[in-house]
């Protein structure tokens, strides 16, 4: 499990975001936390100010940003009302990630199939964008 200031700040944000989303079961919380920690590590090394200015999305004016590297359009589409509209806000990214994972990829509310449905969240498989 990753450690360090960025990882610990993101882990705390995951826990706050899961509470906002109403995910209170300890097993479900562990499923989501484990997967999102893998994604945060792979996408940005837990850097909430990371910006990708290099890929196709960036060339099209829709760069990805934040710990989980959401494009502006995806973040806005899956934004959780009541959370910050700033993509550098980790709690807002966590809530948007849960919404995106469940609605776009069909991940169950308990997160038990998160790693199976989003390869980037699976520590046993190679990194792959989502």
Language-model regions: role of each:
Residues 65-68, 72-130:
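Catalytic and binding regions of secreted/periplasmic enzymes and modules that target cell-wall glycans
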Residues 49-60, 66:
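Short amphipathic helix-turn modules centered on a small-residue break
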Residues 1-4, 22-26, 61, 80-88:
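Second-shell loop/turn segments in exported
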Residues 14-16, 49-52, 76:
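A short alpha-helix capping/helix-coil boundary motif
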Residues 27-54, 94-101, 115-118:
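Short, functionally critical alpha-helical segments immediately adjacent to catalytic or ligand/cofactor-binding
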Residues 1-46:
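Export/targeting segments at the very N-terminus of extracytoplasmic proteins
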Residues 9, 13, 17, 24, ...:
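Catalytic cores of secreted/periplasmic lytic hydrolases that degrade extracellular macromolecules
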